[in-house]
C-alpha cells in the first residue's frame, strides 16, 4: 500500500537527528529562495514575451495604416485619348 503517517514521522525524526534543526532550516530557506527566484524568472520571461508581441502588433498596425486596397480606374478623358491613338 502506501506510506503511513507513522512511517513519515519516524523518517522525519531520523532526518532531524542526523542533520539537526538548524541545518534543515537553512536548507529549507535556500530551497524556498530558489523556488521564489525561479518563479520570478518565469514571470519576467512571460512579461518580456507579452511586451514583444504587443510591440509587434503595434508595428503591424502602423505599417497597415497607410495601405489602401483600391482598383485603378482611368478617367473618361484618358479613355478617349487612348481610343483616338489606336
UniProtKB/Swiss-Prot annotation:
Main location group: membrane
Spans through the membrane: 1-21
GO molecular function annotations of the record: protein transmembrane transporter activity
Keyword Transmembrane helix: yes
Coiled coil residues, start to end: none
Highest taxon listed in the record's lineage: Bacteria
Keyword Secreted recorded: no
BP GO annotations: protein transport by the Tat complex
Pfam families: TatA_B_E
Protein family membership: Belongs to the TatA/E family.
Assembly description: The Tat system comprises two distinct complexes: a TatABC complex, containing multiple copies of TatA, TatB and TatC subunits, and a separate TatA complex, containing only TatA subunits. Substrates initially bind to the TatABC complex, which probably triggers association of the separate TatA complex to form the active translocon.
Function, in words: Part of the twin-arginine translocation (Tat) system that transports large folded proteins containing a characteristic twin-arginine motif in their signal peptide across membranes. TatA could form the protein-conducting channel of the Tat system.
Name recorded for this polypeptide: Sec-independent protein translocase protein TatA
Native species: Hydrogenovibrio crunogenus (strain DSM 25203 / XCL-2)
Gene name of the encoded protein: tatA
Amino acid at each position: 500500500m502506501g506510506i503511513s503517517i507513522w512511517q513519515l514521522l519516524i523518517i522525519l525524526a531520523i532526518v532531524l537527528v542526523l542533520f539537526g534543526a538548524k541545518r534543515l532550516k537553512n536548507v529549507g530557506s535556500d530551497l524556498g529562495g530558489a523556488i521564489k527566484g525561479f518563479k520570478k524568472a518565469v514571470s519576467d520571461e512571460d512579461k518580456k514575451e507579452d511586451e514583444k508581441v504587443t510591440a509587434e502588433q503595434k508595428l503591424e498596425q502602423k505599417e497597415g495604416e497607410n495601405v489602401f486596397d483600391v482598383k485603378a480606374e482611368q478617367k473618361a478623358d484618358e479613355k478617349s485619348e487612348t481610343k483616338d491613338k489606336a
